[in-house]
């Protein structure tokens, strides 16, 4: 099954709007086992749309067009497709009722061209638009490709696709199979290294499929399985996840497409009823603020300091931090932080003097992390960063969060991979 995705809109061609719709749909199609080998953008010109359709019809089984369903003069997608497949356009009565009701409610006379939005391909299926007026269409052909038409605004397209199109495609093309996706999240390992470690599994594993995705501070693996029931599909994913984590489990921190490292740490702190205090000389309170956004209990954060002078009888400038005394100083600072603020956990983050590495604004910064708890567990680690200072700070925030997570999960520290 091959699908082709075509975005329609002159504003896309001119770079005035970034097209987020095509990648969103392509990822979802891949998860369903429907591959998209061709994608394109075409302006709102009837001749250009028709030329693109002729090419797509020769090489694809499903042609997906996004945009051009509105009331404007250059919203021509439905009209060109109806001409191409020799079908009429008819109004969707429910959508027309919604459109008229809205105009009555705001006491505005409806312009005639608004009527175009509620038209869909005759003998096709109208697709409901919960956040707009432009109706989508799904049309199955007996002797050519099928057509799927959706509105261009992402806030209309995404809900339509998720709520109505995905179930429709599953019924039409998956033949009773159920899809289940599982997202696994990893921190402290790069995509290239992770892919290398699980490469044999990725090659041999066909159900579920495995795809990796590099985020700014982490890597995710998406597993997508097909089975005759939701329970069987979920079981396939869980078995594959267990195999993956025998290889890279040291870096695994959680499941879920909308999960995050700070959410996991916040949950662990609250579940274990632990309070934490921090001295952030390098990150200047950003670990606390990041964590605070994920916490439901504000008392979990016992407070903190952005400098060492409040805890030591020296100013920050008078303390010379180096590899010789970094571990000792950050350990002492974590202990003092915990004691002074009466927390279960004390965390300290310090950095050695940065050095320019001669590349733009990049600087080499070695950062020390220390964590101490009432259980007399002491974790100390250091990491070198070599981006611009702000990026180094952002990276350090997540290293600190992972240190807290490893303490609460009773996991050992591992080297960055």
UniProtKB/Swiss-Prot annotation:
SUPFAM superfamilies: CinA-like (SSF142433), Molybdenum cofactor biosynthesis proteins (SSF53218)
CDD domains xref list: cinA
Domain of life: Bacteria
Spans traversing the lipid bilayer: none
InterPro entries reported in the protein's UniProt record: CinA (IPR050101), CinA-like_C (IPR036653), CinA_C (IPR008136), CinA_KH (IPR041424), Competence-induced_CinA (IPR008135), MoaB/Mog-like_dom_sf (IPR036425), MoaB/Mog_dom (IPR001453)
Family recorded in the similarity comment: Belongs to the CinA family.
HAMAP family to which the protein is assigned, alphabetical: CinA_B
UniProt protein name: Putative competence-damage inducible protein
